[in-house]
Amino acid sequence: MIERFGVSRTTVRKAIENLVVRGLVEIRRGRGTFVAQPKVIQELTELTGFVEDMQALGRNPTARLLDGQLVPADADVARQLAVSPGSLVMRIQRVRLADGVAMSFDETYLPREIGEKIVTHDLESEPIFSLLEERYNLPLIEAEYRLEAVTATPTVAQALAVEPGNPVFLIERTSYSSEHRPIDYEKLHYRGDLIRFITRLSRRPRARS
């Protein structure tokens, strides 16, 4: 680039730094500088699953199943699913991809009686939300979202093909069926460089003093 455009190394470095700040390129340690993937814009305005979100954006969603097994519920999982700490729940780990690019590492926790049914299906092609609602008649009525910026643990980094310590969005989502019954608790780790979340807020009328 220096020879082609007849500029100094300092000028090239500053230009690349500017492109990184603008999110147009990314620097990968030991590999070089690459054009950045365009960010997926995801609205947090209704309860939807990954497949529904990506299809709405014209992306091709796929999944890679890493694990599905019964594990003892820790205090957090037990609280979210309203079960006793230490009781067995189903944990399902998947990598979610859009157009072949890893977007999210998902950990899904289900009550044992539901989870043992869900894992008998092909979870690389059948969305869990669809199975719950259409196969097992468990309509998802509402969910609670908790969004946090965190750094990738070695496990998350390996799943998403990023460096440990890279920024990721962590969404904790508890979905409820009828009578406010929690049936699905998820920890969704999204690559921070590939997604942007937006929402719309309305202001409640205030009483005039």
Segments from the language model and where they lie:
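All-alpha effector-binding/dimerization core of bacterial HTH-type transcriptional repressors
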Residues: Q37-S209
